[in-house]
Amino acid sequence: MTPPRRRGNSLDGRTWTRYSISVWSDIRKSKEELALKHPALFPAQLVERLIECFLPPEGNIVLDPFCGLGSTVVAAHSLDRVGIGLDINPEYVEVARRRLGPCSDGCRIVCADAGAVSDHVEPETVDLAITSPPYWDVLTRRRSADRKAIRNYGDDGKDLGRVSDYQQFLAALGAVFGKVQRALRPRAYCIVVVMDLRKGKVFHPFHSDLAAVMQEVGYLWDDTIVWDRRHEYNNFRPLGYPAVFRINKAHEYVLIFQKPARDSATSAR
């Protein structure tokens, strides 16, 4: 007898097809999320969809090592899954815990830097990781192109958003995601939401640079989704005008990585 085919998720065929389109333009923040005014909050709706797509039916634990205001944990809880989040900023942790509420059903939000994942999560117990790491130190610098004010995640010395050297920043992320990989079960996905960056005259293709680091750590780069955020912006400015034409970035990359199976020739280091 042929064994039943393993299901990757619980979606029906119609929803599977709709979600498989490579550009997602229908994700919206809730009124509650808009009111939080976090510098880089991604909506629970995005996380819910990613869980629906990449968490197998038997999967239960979802990890976010840079949980910010807790969207990943809140979304996991809303889908009757267990979310675990870490964040270095105690103010954000407090808000995230309020969002989660007292009936957390095993979900937890820890005030710790992302590098402490191994202290709070056992090896090979996580079924899916979803996160958005800091945008380097870009938010701590005044932007000449659009003159937006400085925005800061915090002043902890372990905050990766304060690392000024780009290569050191990428290396630090690689160390974190190496620990995340050890926490993941074989073949589990790690999904990272990022935007490309510009510091002064230098453009940094953050999504591809991070993807290279992730592959060095041992992940398989499985695919990419473009998250179209144009509807969130109603105050675009002519960046660089009139001297240098600059691009208004209104999209982010949803990078889809997978931990190899144990018997893979490219298994994690």
Report residues per predicted region.
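Class I S-adenosyl-L-methionine-dependent methyltransferase catalytic core
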Residues: 1-269
